[in-house]
């Protein structure tokens, strides 16, 4: 066995794992009808003129199953947080109570659930494409090593096995998220 080729295989697996984790984080940000602070991950607040992630300027809690409460560390940015939420794609009206902001998540309609499932499927396809790109790059690196034909074939089969395994994990994650979205 070739030490360089083994290192390339490890690197490929690490990159595929990171792609899967990134997809998991994207899925966590998809609203399911239950309050989840991760849906606010993409919200950026103008804090002293700098766009800052909401999580860095406020604590986010889940007081009820359908509600999020955002309490800023600095009350002077309550209006900025409210503006950031209003301009986001969340379509959730913020309620400012003077010390924090409440977001009540309405129940998802059947049509909205199906639309979210389609979005999840698009994310899954992008995740699979990323994994296939990792496979392609890994195969190119392996071919440049000048291995014997048999060794090269064995390593390329290993890379394909990793690719198949991670694509299957993406499918499982997608099925799980889709079922969660369609569960009324």
UniProtKB/Swiss-Prot annotation:
Gene3D superfamilies attached to this UniProt entry: 3.30.1360.40, Ribosome-recycling factor (1.10.132.20)
Residues forming coiled coils: none
UniProt KW keywords: Cytoplasm, Protein biosynthesis
One Gene Ontology cellular component annotation held by this UniProt entry: cytoplasm
Cell location: Cytoplasm
GO molecular function, one term: ribosomal large subunit binding
One GO biological process term: translational termination
KW Cytoplasm (keyword) present: yes
Domain of life: Bacteria
InterPro entries: Ribosome_recyc_fac (IPR002661), Ribosome_recyc_fac_dom (IPR023584), RRF_sf (IPR036191)
Xref: HAMAP family: RRF
Record-stated family: Belongs to the RRF family.
Purpose of the protein: Responsible for the release of ribosomes from messenger RNA at the termination of protein biosynthesis. May increase the efficiency of translation by recycling ribosomes from one round of translation to another.
Protein name: Ribosome-recycling factor
